[in-house]
Amino acid sequence: MAGFEAGGRRAEADNDRIRLVLLIGAVVSFGLIGGLSGLVVVSSFVVMLVLHELGHFVVARLSGMQVTEFFIGFGPRLWSVRRGETTYGVKAIPAGAYVRITGMSSLDEVDPAVEHRTYRQQSYPRRMAVALAGSATHFAVALALLFFVYVAVGRPDPTRWVVGQVVSGSAAASIDVRVGDRIVSVAGIETPGFEDFGVIVRGLPGRDVAVVLERDGESSRHTMTVGERLMVDGTVAGFFGVGPDRPMETLGPVGAGVEASARFVDLVGMSVDGLVGFFTPDGLVSFLTGGEESSEGSAPGMSAGGGGSIQVADPGVDPADEDRLLSIYGAARLGSAMLDDGWTTYLWFLILINVFIGVFNLVPLLPLDGGHVAIATYERIRSVGGRRHMADATRLIPLTWAVVTLLVAVAVVALYRDIVDLPDFG
């Protein structure tokens, strides 16, 4: 009998290895078919979701809770190993990860011997820490990437601009303005910002003016006639014929930390506005029926929902589609386009998506992390006189299923729209 058992275990281990090799082969094949950028984007999504669950896992273990499983992927098991009381492994569908913490609700049946180590028996601060750990991980990743971008890449210097492009045959071309030149003044008026420059030029149609240029540290004075452009309202505005390029300004550690924190707060606020604007009755009905989405409350970024839906607004996308909700497929295509545009653009994509996933998971409804936060807070408020109140999880089942159904419907509609009419990301 022992020999049969040992042989069975060896056969199962061999099957695990075969399935794992097949998964690796499938991933490599996807990279060859979808290209390196597609593989990088999908891998980034998986890593983000694994880090989310890793946050829950680490905090639960540090809090003394029993964690029985930590798996990457879903579906059939490909490989697993048991270390202590936790089974670690990989499953066939690399769509994220999950952690199984004992006693997450009052409905879970638990061995009385480990009841004291369940999630439901822990103190309010410990339960809050575990529930918030996933979103906190996304926020930490976003802040770290923001800090890196400002230190390594920088931000556009608001006090300086140079010529980034010159229109052929324009007034600028007539005096040999070149890319990289700095326009110091027009008609004796200094132009510290491109917006200031535009205001000045638009008010000088057909006028002969003096222009001071700076090239390679040397200044030169030129005289030119400002071009003319007919505006929509019938007025004539001045036209110079240049586009701006704002030099990047790298920041030191302190400045980068301050800038990253301020930008992070802005992104959180925009994500909240976007979620509130979308998950209103009008917003949902408009989306599910294929109508135009309201731009009110929309945010330039991504918001992740159940089934992996992401709301995107990007300057490179057609305005009609810029507030459109994308499925995970559409988001992957967008990420690939951003990666093709350069690593800096792709880092901003990762920053935005991490912030939005973190915020979305704090929505106070099960099965999202925010639902566990709401339940823990409700139980804390109801627990008086030293008596612990435990919420009746059976009452939450209908609401939970309603939320899941809504999120699945949104994800399916978003996927359908992306398949039949995916926006052109360039």
Question: For each predicted feature, which ranges?
Answer:
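Small-residue-rich helix-interface/hinge motifs
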Residues: 2-5, 36-113, 353, 360-384
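Functional transmembrane alpha-helices
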Residues: 13-16, 117-118, 122, 229-357, ...
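Final/C-terminal transmembrane alpha-helix of multipass membrane proteins
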Residues: 26-29, 397-418
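PDZ-domain C-terminal substructure recognizer with occasional recognition of PDZ-binding tails
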Residues: 178, 184-185, 198-241
